[in-house]
């Protein structure tokens, strides 16, 4: 077990418009930020904001924000964002186990809250 599995890091998330990955829960992290957090490409991370959280598969991207990452505009980014911060927001990120969240997972969470 990696020690970083026990640590949360605050990060800035930017919601991007275009991506082929829009149907998958993918987060693009800056390689230096990922290294500082002990996160590697292909890892699954939990991204949480308030009482909302999802799991994302990590890809590294040099042009991602230095202090965080990019989530393609999708059901996943919309679930974490709100009207005041739908393009950029702060969130916690930590290593997670299991697979990335699916569209069905998001729909199930929303329906359970009603």
Model-derived regions, located:
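Long, contiguous, secondary-structure-rich segments that constitute the structural scaffold
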Residues: 1-29, 33-114
């Amino acid at each position: 077990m990696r020690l970083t599995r026990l640590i949360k890091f605050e990060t800035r998330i930017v919601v991007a418009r275009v991506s082929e990955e829009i149907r998958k829960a993918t987060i693009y992290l800056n390689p230096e930020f990922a290294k500082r957090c002990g996160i590697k490409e292909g890892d699954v991370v939990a991204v949480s904001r308030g009482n909302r959280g999802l799991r994302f598969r990590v890809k590294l991207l040099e042009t991602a924000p230095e202090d965080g990452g990019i989530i393609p505009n999708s059901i996943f980014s919309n679930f974490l964002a709100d009207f005041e911060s739908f393009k950029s927001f702060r969130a916690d990120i930590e290593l997670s186990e299991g697979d990335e969240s699916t569209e069905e997972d998001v729909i199930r969470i929303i329906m359970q809250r009603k």
